[in-house]
Amino acid sequence: VYITNAGDITLSPKGVEMAHVNNVRLYVHGERWTASQPGDWGSQWQVEAPIFVDHGYVSQDCYYPIIKGRSVITNQGFVTAVDLGIRRVNNNWGQAIIRVGSAEACPAAGHPNAVFEFHYDGTFYSPGNGHFNDVYIRSDGRLKINKKELENGALEKVCRLKVYTYDKVKSIKDRSVIKREVGIIAQDLEKELPEAVSKVEVDGSDVLTISNSAVNALLIKAIQEMSEEIKELKTPLFTKIARKISKYFKF
């Protein structure tokens, strides 16, 4: 350990500088780490990191931050904290959590607290809306096997679906209202097109979700059926009669 007259501290285990601390920052020489690591995905399960926090044994339902930051606007307040940590739930793998919210009081006191969840299976949960330039969903035909064209009846399915206006609440347990929305109900869609509905677990409760891609496909099929019906309505009467006669007589 080296300490300068200016108060800077350098950590140099075995004579190799690993970290430098002064009154404004902590600097870690990550290149020392990379020089001794393969950097492959396969071994990451057993690899630590230049800065490593081991929480050890914890309870079945808990959350502990790994790193946290906080700031406050001068003369205004709004003390806000952001942290990254690990959440544990009973009998399951952990979740990575990014939490953004008030550092003045708890959510029960009415202060904001957004929790973003990253699950071990790749699932991501956000408590609010997502705003993107665009969203692309994999739909390459080479990724789809056992294809079968959807049978007629899509128009009837769409007509049976009801559109509601409703208040959207945060979760099954937290009934506080997020905002007023308009849309369809997953349980209704499941009766008509079960492939469009999936079930996920949120805070210990099963919640139904809807695939917009599947709904769009159903609407496309319904429009195609409606187009055929319109064509039939526009067909002259004598043409319809000729079609029926042609089924019984060959000319």
Swiss-Prot record:
The record marks S139, D140 as: Cleavage. Keywords: Host-virus interaction, Viral attachment to host cell, Viral tail fiber protein, Viral tail protein, Virion, Virus entry into host cell. Residues 134-137 are annotated as: Interaction with the receptor-recognizing protein gp38. Its main location: virion. It comes from Enterobacteria phage M1. It holds the Pfam family Peptidase_S74. GO terms for cellular component: virus tail, fiber. PROSITE patterns: ICA. GO terms for biological process: symbiont entry into host cell; virion attachment to host cell. Belongs to the S16-like long tail fiber protein Gp37 family. It is found in: Virion. Proteolytic cleavage and release of the chaperone in the host cytosol stabilizes the folded protein. Residues 139-237 form the Peptidase S74 domain. Homotrimer. Interacts with the receptor-recognizing protein Gp38. The gene is 37. This is Long tail fiber protein Gp37. Signal peptide: none annotated. The keyword Amino-acid biosynthesis does not apply. Disulfide bonds: none annotated.
